[in-house]
Amino acid sequence: MDQEEEEIEIPNYFICPISLEIMKDPVTTVSGITYDRQNIVKWLEKVPSCPVTKQPLPLDSDLTPNHMLRRLIQHWCVENETRGVVRISTPRVPPGKLNVVEEIKNLKKFGQEALGREETLQKLEVLAMDGNNRRLMCECGVHKSLILFVVKCTSEDEDGRRRIKGLDESLRLLHLIGIPSNDAKTILMENDRVMESLTWVLHQEDFLSKAYTIVLLRNLTEYTSSHIVERLNPEIFKGIIGFLKDVVNSVNRTSPTVRETVQSSSRPSLGKTEPSKLDHSLVIKQAVTAALMILLETSSWSRNRSLLVDLGAVSELIELEISYTGEKRITELMLGVLSRLCCCANGRAEILAHRGGIAVVTKRLLRVSPAADDRAISILTTVSKFSPENMVVEEMVNVGTVEKLCSVLGMDCGLNLKEKAKEILKDHFDEWKKFPCIDITLLTKLLSISPKGPKI
């Protein structure tokens, strides 16, 4: 056999478990597995866990360069150069703390020309593409400087104008590096203009910037004082609901501008490219989840529930669920918010008024998760107990709720779920009998049996 035809045997420990190719810049994660740096960074941006061990790995977790393995790979490449193997180059040393601090100083020089600020933001974003740099940037306070920069961008000057050059890039960079929980606790309490700035962004046209803003808002409200969360400005709720409406329109192909934003990450870019490699569709999905989490948390208070119902949240949540079929987490959150909005009469009325309200809740029952089941049955219980009987009964018959509740009684599921299903069927039994499509014999039999929990 000729030397050229001889198959080259590559040592297994030279291969990246993700790409199955020779590693160019091997780094070891805290889980003990070594990957090529570029591959593991991309992986962690979408899935925060070790591909091999499944151990949780935050995006900012340490990636330790494996210099010895890299030298072994380089030595092996040199030895096999005559067989067509190209030597991997030594990766550049990531910029250190001094570089980051210098860029922060540039960022703070708000009075400089816009081009200077843009270059600073681009340099910071390039730094943030390296997983090791993100923690360093947080230690240096990049996130704090960026938030102040966003506030300045959205604040009116003496002429009543806003200098928004660099605003979109700042929001994207904040999304990339995140905000440490310790700082998130105090940012809103120390500067009330932050909330004003984020509210302003939510009412602008740029769809992606609104997505970044909602994720940022969730990060800030998650750890801050409950008093701030309880008294959020109605304009914030209006902006969040408007964002969800835009998402629904993009899925339903009625908003071309938004749809292009969602799809742009999958198309090759021409000309000047942005340094960020964030997947736009993933960012929007994260923003939808963040928006629902904000609504779920804030709807604990009656004042906020009334505001959300008046702003049309019930209808938009139902439309979102219809459009986002198959997204488990989004379904669970949506049902959670709806179950809280059902605590007020107007919320229950809105669910009944929407043609798909009871139908979509019924359809998700027993199809998603135990958490979704609990929230769906809670909605049906509240609506059936406190809404006009004639409206509830007819709607539940028409959309198959009665049959689904009978299925709950006959399935191996939670005892609490069965008891609530039985309660609904029992409360309206006399009305169900009037409908020829209802199997009264089966219904009577099911109601006579004591509910039992799942078999162990």
Curated annotation (Swiss-Prot):
SUPFAM superfamilies: ARM repeat (SSF48371), RING/U-box (SSF57850)
Annotated catalysed reactions: S-ubiquitinyl-[E2 ubiquitin-conjugating enzyme]-L-cysteine + [acceptor protein]-L-lysine = [E2 ubiquitin-conjugating enzyme]-L-cysteine + N(6)-ubiquitinyl-[acceptor protein]-L-lysine
Name of one Pfam family that matches: U-box
Post-translational events: Auto-ubiquitinated.
Domain U-box: from-to ranges: 9-83
Pathways per UniProt: Protein modification; protein ubiquitination
Inducers of expression: By the bacterial elicitor flg22, and bacterial and oomycete pathogens.
One example of a Gene Ontology biological process annotation: protein ubiquitination
Keywords: Plant defense, Repeat, Transferase, Ubl conjugation, Ubl conjugation pathway
Molecular function per GO: ubiquitin protein ligase activity; ubiquitin-protein transferase activity
Role noted for this protein: E3 ubiquitin-protein ligase that acts as a negative regulator of the immunity triggered by the pathogen-associated molecular patterns (PAMPs), in association with PUB22 and PUB23.
Name recorded for this polypeptide: E3 ubiquitin-protein ligase PUB24
Species of provenance: Arabidopsis thaliana
